[in-house]
A protein has these predicted regions:
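Bacterial Sec-dependent N-terminal signal peptides
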Residues: 1-44
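Beta-strand-centric surfaces of beta-sandwich/beta-rich domains
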Residues: 44-418
Length: 418
């Protein structure tokens, strides 16, 4: 039997007191109190299976791993891969029954779903407590017309409402490799999300096809854990905005956020309507009542996205001549992962995709938050140009609920990339 400090004290107390082993009651009481404090602290610090990384991967916990896909819509234990070929005529129950007709049940009968125009499909409906730890999906069709929404703890207004392409950094509707800690996009359209998303009571994830023509084919997997959630855990939020054109030249990434939380990052899709360098604009964070002047002000757009000097490395070509060109890059926390240079025919516009994740440096707020970025380039003669670009963004943050209601999402005609 393992001897604990409590056992040792019990043995001592049972001994007949003598001059040599008599222990004052005050010392016994203090010893017991110290042990209780240590055991309470240990219980509170018991690993819950969240915040996984290489530094704690060896730690065991009581967390339960579950996963939702079209092969197991509920994520229940022992309920995956049960699609029946006899249900081939029912929508989204045995969609690949024809391909599996020679093999039968258990052989990839329902790996995907189809969502018709105007329909919303519930991808996940989970009872907590727990946390989403990874989402993988590969949506077909026009990504701006597929709207991802997430609801926490039975709320009626979504905490996440974003076109699926923009949520994964693909706002221009075309693939570009994105490799970061929070989001990865791999060939040919494999969207991966690693933002941790804890919830206490319930998690609901939906996808809506707002297009008017084509059905959406979607393969997806939502990996989550059922475990206790810390009392100080905030809820994940993501909100989409677009201005085309940005008539104010002072683009709002987010405003109207109320409560306590922290800003975790942004993805931006910027389409430039003028010649020359377009990224002189400063980002500004208005925190907890700031009005005319912010608490935090950046020094330029490429600076905020952790680059410098127009993202230009000024490389020499094969002839030894210096050439100016944008240099795409991906890092764990920031990147210029997409540059669409135009083809000189119908795709004439320069377009850029950028991300910045504040994973190690979140911008904290206690009451409210507003974030803006200037749409700023150059006139001739060294004068700033207030631009009118096509700008879309997704702001990511965590906060305590309830959250303020989001602005109305634009209709598909205003979302369209053209």
């Amino acid at each position: 039997m393992r001897i604990t400090p409590f056992h040792s004290l019990f043995i001592i107390l049972r001994k007949k007191p003598t001059n040599s082993n008599c222990i004052p009651m005050k010392k016994i009481f203090l010893s017991l109190l110290a042990i209780l404090v240590i055991q309470t602290a240990f219980a509170q610090n018991k690993f819950n299976g969240l915040d996984m990384n290489m530094g704690n991967l060896y730690r065991l916990s009581d967390a339960k791993t579950r996963s939702i896909s079209p092969e197991n819509f509920t994520g229940e234990k022992g309920k995956a891969g049960m699609a029946d070929p006899a249900d081939k005529d029912k929508p989204n129950v045995a969609n690949a029954a024809g391909a599996a007709r020679d093999l039968g049940q258990g052989w990839k009968l329902n790996p995907f779903i189809r969502i018709k125009p105007g329909e919303t499909f519930t991808l996940a409906d989970i009872d907590g407590p727990g946390a989403i730890q990874h989402i993988w999906m590969t949506p077909a069709g026009k990504w701006r017309f597929n709207i991802l929404r997430i609801y926490w703890d039975g709320e009626t207004e979504p905490s996440v409402e974003v076109p699926v392409g923009d949520f994964f950094g693909m706002g221009w509707g075309s693939y570009s490799q994105l490799t970061s800690l929070a989001v990865c996009v791999n060939p040919g359209s494999a969207f991966n999300c690693y933002w941790p998303m804890p919830f206490r009571k319930k998690c609901k994830i939906t996808m809506e096809n707002i297009g008017d023509a084509d059905p959406m084919t979607l393969y997806y997997q939502i990996d989550y854990t059922l475990t206790e959630v810390p009392a100080d855990a905030g809820y994940f939020h993501a909100q989409f905005r677009r201005q085309n054109p940005d008539v104010t030249s002072d683009y709002t990434i987010i405003d109207g956020v109320k409560g306590k939380g922290h800003y975790a990052g942004v993805y931006m899709a910027i389409g430039v309507n003028n010649n020359g360098w377009w990224g002189e604009g400063e980002i500004k964070f208005f925190i907890d009542g700031d009005t005319k002047f912010p608490t935090i002000c950046g020094t330029g757009t490429e600076d905020y996205f952790c680059g410098s000097y127009d993202f230009d490395t000024n490389k020499k070509n094969a002839a030894g001549v210096m050439e100016s060109n944008y240099t795409e890059f991906c890092t764990p926390y920031s990147g210029l992962h997409q540059v669409i240079r135009g083809d000189g025919h119908y795709s004439v516009m320069q377009r850029f995709g950028l991300y910045r994740w504040h994973i190690v440096d979140p911008v904290r707020f206690d009451k409210d938050l507003k974030v803006t970025i200037q749409d700023l380039g150059w006139h001739q003669g060294g004068r700033y140009l207030a631009q009118k670009s096509d700008i879309a963004s997704v702001c990511f943050w965590y906060q305590a609920e309830p959250h303020a209601k989001f602005p109305v999402l634009p209709a598909w005609r205003e979302l369209e990339v053209n």
